Amino acid sequence: MTKICDFDDKMNYIGDYSSTGYARLAKSLIDIVKEQQAKLGYRKEIVRLYYPLSTLRHFFECAGDDNKIAAGMISEQQMLEILAPNNLPKQLTDTIGEIKITAKNERFCIEIPPEGSEYVHENTADNEFISELIALVGTHGCTMEQITELFYKYSDDIEKKDMQNGEFDCYIRFLNEPDDTYYYCFHDEGCHIIYHRFLPQDYADFGF
């Protein structure tokens, strides 16, 4: 496969790295690791995260035309090539480390080394909102009113909508927070409230 992206001989991306699929992937990985560390605490250990091919396609096909690595629908094999060790930019490996990728039936396992977990713990700012949300939904008697108030604590510009798909009751999202574009989907299970968050493109794919 021919790459359109340009790298120097040290694998530094010499274009606008921040608009590449690699940067989008790195942000997603860091977001999830931070969420896990807020839930479970920090350990310097391997973390394995799983992505469907459709999500990885969004990362790389949503970049500007000059930064696309492959045109059209990226296949599983093409994605494995994109994420091969010799194709990973130094900007990515300097943060979350030398990730390892495997795939089966369009489901990708991304293995982050212990150094990546350590980097997230020591070099990224705590996500106070996520920490508070996790603590809130973990308390007995938590209500959607309390959750909504928490969102308003961090922004006056949010959107909350009911969902009628049988899986979630509603979603809330920040409208003008470029670092947090997730749809936070909530379901009241009676004894407690659970949530899952989705990137906008994935939320659209699910057709909720």
Where are these regions (language model features)?
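Short glycine-rich, basic-tinged beta-strand/loop micro-motifs
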Residues: G41-G64, F129-V137
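Intrinsically disordered, low-complexity regulatory segments enriched in Ser/Thr/Pro
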Residues: P178-F208
